[in-house]
């Protein structure tokens, strides 16, 4: 099958399914529809239309449907990273352009856009990172991965961004997320994730981050909401606004740098609270 024919058939399939979705119940069925579309489109991951591998072209109507459906699914389950990813890609065009321009205006960010590094297990020297002294950025990042039982390979590839350079900016944001957890001293429990989202919302302006920052607190208990509102939230927003563009840092060349020194360079204050990775409970620093 020729490449244009394959793409046309895929788009027609998307449009037909989107028309079917609009005729059903709005909220419950749109989440189901976007999951159905996403599964159907996954088979096109290996397709290369000339923009970048795995790109899936969509028109504005299809993007809107995907945005609404993935948003509903993400609200129902914030740990549905595939739905969060679709929401970010279908709503973030303007914010991605701003982030791209900030990276272009920074020498280190420009180098990143030119060299296109990836943060994956295949690109990390875990043995070397484990040998670094405590307090170094690389050692603390590895400790974060171990303590929270996460892996950089869990970040899915971008599919729905219709610009190759902006697609990389989104991918870089996605792969830098766990590094931000390390920089901010936040675990991956709900309180830690919401605090990071408040930082990201102020730093990136991505609609997905703003939505997560606004709605994430609704999933917190009263005891966990109090430290967010009185301490973690204001700290996260303030630092998100004042920090250097976090996408413009070549973290792969900073593993040996001390975490404290890197925070100072980025103009990020140490967290006001210590949150244990094994518990949702926040405790004040002594």
Where do the model's predicted regions map?
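Generic secretory/membrane-interface signal
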Residues: 23-24, 36-39, 71, 166, ...
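Polar low-complexity intrinsically disordered regions enriched in Ser/Thr and small residues
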Residues: 26-28, 72, 188
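N-terminal mitochondrial targeting presequence
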Residues: 1-54, 286
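Leu/Val/Ala/Ile-rich N-terminal alpha-helices, chiefly Sec-type signal peptides and the beginnings
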Residues: 36-96
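Charge-dense, extended regions
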Residues: 260-285
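A generic alpha-helix propensity feature with a strong bias for hydrophobic helices
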Residues: 60, 110, 273-275
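Core of folded catalytic or high-affinity ligand/protein-binding domains
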Residues: 76-264, 268
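Compositionally biased, low-complexity repeat tracts
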Residues: 19-21, 36, 46, 50, ...
């Amino acid at each position: 099958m020729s490449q244009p024919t394959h793409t046309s058939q895929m788009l027609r399939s998307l449009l037909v399914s989107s028309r079917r979705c609009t005729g059903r119940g709005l909220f419950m069925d749109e989440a189901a529809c976007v999951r159905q579309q996403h599964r159907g489109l996954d088979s096109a991951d290996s397709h290369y239309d000339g923009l970048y591998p795995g790109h899936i072209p969509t028109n504005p109507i299809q993007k809107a449907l995907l945005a609404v459906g993935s948003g509903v699914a993400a609200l129902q389950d914030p740990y549905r990273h595939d739905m969060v990813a679709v929401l970010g890609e279908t709503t973030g065009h303007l914010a991605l352009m701003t982030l791209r321009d900030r990276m272009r205006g920074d020498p280190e960010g420009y180098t990143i856009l030119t060299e296109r590094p990836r943060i994956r297990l295949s690109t990390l020297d875990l043995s070397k990172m484990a040998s670094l002294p405590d307090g170094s950025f690389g050692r603390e990042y590895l400790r974060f991965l171990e303590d929270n039982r996460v892996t950089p390979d869990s970040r899915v590839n971008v599919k729905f961004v219709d610009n190759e350079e902006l697609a990389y900016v989104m991918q870089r944001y996605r792969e830098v997320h766990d590094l931000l957890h390390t920089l901010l001293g936040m675990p991956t429990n709900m309180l830690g994730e919401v605090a990071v989202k408040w930082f990201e919302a102020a730093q990136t302006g991505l609609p997905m981050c703003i939505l997560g920052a606004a709605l994430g607190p609704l999933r917190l208990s009263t005891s966990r909401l109090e430290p967010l509102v009185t301490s973690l939230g204001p700290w996260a927003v303030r630092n998100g606004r004042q920090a250097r563009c976090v996408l413009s840092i070549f973290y792969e060349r900073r593993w040996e740098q001390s975490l404290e020194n890197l925070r100072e360079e980025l103009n990020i204050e140490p967290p006001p609270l210590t949150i244990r990775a094994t518990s949702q409970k926040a405790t004040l620093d002594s």
